């Protein structure tokens, strides 16, 4: 690992000259390919939780950006589509049955996963798009027309509902991607972006839009927070009224309740949202 970090950091310092040195570039491409393969395996991650805090491995982002910079686009095609891109699909079109059995996933027609993405066992991928650097942990469903942005981190046993957008980020290097922790539900057509963290067990209703500057309001106390959906919260869309009655209110996300983990495990999503 240290060797990768050292090579990536050194290459980053001379990235503008890298393409001019064919010998050095050829050797370095092997390092980049190794990093991409380790992203595929989940042994390297863009972002990791350390001591209860999420830390960005910015050298991995640099590796992905260098991969884009040093890779030539090529033509890809299958039986019904063609495209021209620098990033190969994670699952080749001629992939054999054993590859999917070994992965332990379910992947339906219309789904697209770029290489450099980790997909854990028992993940279900409906027709959706998962970008490079993303990490999808065990037992999660990525539902129809959901998009998972570059480097986004999705935990275990999550449901990312139909049409949901989970934002990613490659630049700035220090910025966190969107992080959805274990056992979360993100409702249909919601959008979580700009490095927001949805903590474990949270339930986000349909049609909720949360970015870094979105006000997240506790309904009971009126307290306003930003950038984090607290663990086991139930969140719905809302409006903060204007103090002046003739002026428009502003959109917000509202925490209508928080439940303990035992209740969250026993009670259905619909019950939480409707009660």
Curated annotation (Swiss-Prot):
One of its GO terms (cellular component) is cytoplasm. Its EC number is 2.3.1.117. InterPro entries: DapD_Trfase_Hexpep_rpt_fam, Hexapep, THP_succinylTrfase_dom1, THP_succinylTrfase_N_sf, Trans_hexapeptide_repeat, Trimer_LpxA-like_sf. GO terms for molecular function: 2,3,4,5-tetrahydropyridine-2,6-dicarboxylate N-succinyltransferase activity. Substrate binds at residues 106, 143. It catalyses: (S)-2,3,4,5-tetrahydrodipicolinate + succinyl-CoA + H2O = (S)-2-succinylamino-6-oxoheptanedioate + CoA. Pathway: Amino-acid biosynthesis; L-lysine biosynthesis via DAP pathway; LL-2,6-diaminopimelate from (S)-tetrahydrodipicolinate (succinylase route): step 1/3. It holds the Pfam family Hexapep_2. GO terms for biological process: diaminopimelate biosynthetic process; lysine biosynthetic process via diaminopimelate. HAMAP family: DapD. Homotrimer. NCBIfam families: dapD, PRK11830.1. Belongs to the transferase hexapeptide repeat family. PANTHER family: 2,3,4,5-TETRAHYDROPYRIDINE-2,6-DICARBOXYLATE N-ACETYLTRANSFERASE, ACETYLTRANSFERASE. This is 2,3,4,5-tetrahydropyridine-2,6-dicarboxylate N-succinyltransferase. It comes from Rickettsia bellii (strain RML369-C). The lineage of its organism: Bacteria, Pseudomonadati, Pseudomonadota, Alphaproteobacteria, Rickettsiales. The gene is dapD.
């Amino acid at each position: 690992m240290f060797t990768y970090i050292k090579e990536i950091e050194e290459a980053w310092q001379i990235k503008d000259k890298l393409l001019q040195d064919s010998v050095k570039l050829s050797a370095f491409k092997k390092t980049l390919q190794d990093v991409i393969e380790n992203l595929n395996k989940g042994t390297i991650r863009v972002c990791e939780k350390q001591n209860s805090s999420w830390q960005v491995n910015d050298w991995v982002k640099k590796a992905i950006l260098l991969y884009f910079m040093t890779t030539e686009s090529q033509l890809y095609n299958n039986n019904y589509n063609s495209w021209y891109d620098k990033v190969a699909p994670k699952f080749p079109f001629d992939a054999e049955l054993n590859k999917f059995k070994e992965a332990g996933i379910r992947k339906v027609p219309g789904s697209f996963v770029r290489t450099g993405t980790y997909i854990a066992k028992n993940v279900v991928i409906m027709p959706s798009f998962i970008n490079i650097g993303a990490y999808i942990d065990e037992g999660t469903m990525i539902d129809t027309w959901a998009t998972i942005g570059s480097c986004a981190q999705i935990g275990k046993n999550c449901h990312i509902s139909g049409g949901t957008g989970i934002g990613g980020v490659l630049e700035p290097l220090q910025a966190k991607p969107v992080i959805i922790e274990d056992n979360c539900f993100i409702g249909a057509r919601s959008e979580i972006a700009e490095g927001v963290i949805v903590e474990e067990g949270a339930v986000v209703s349909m049609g909720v839009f949360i970015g870094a500057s979105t006000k997240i309001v506790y309904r009971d106390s009126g307290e306003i927070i930003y950038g984090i959906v607290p663990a086991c919260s139930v969140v719905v869309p809302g409006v903060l009224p204007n103090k002046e009655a003739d002026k428009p209110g502003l959109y917000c996300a509202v925490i209508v309740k928080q439940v303990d983990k035992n209740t969250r495990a026993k009670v259905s999503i619909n019950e939480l949202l409707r009660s």
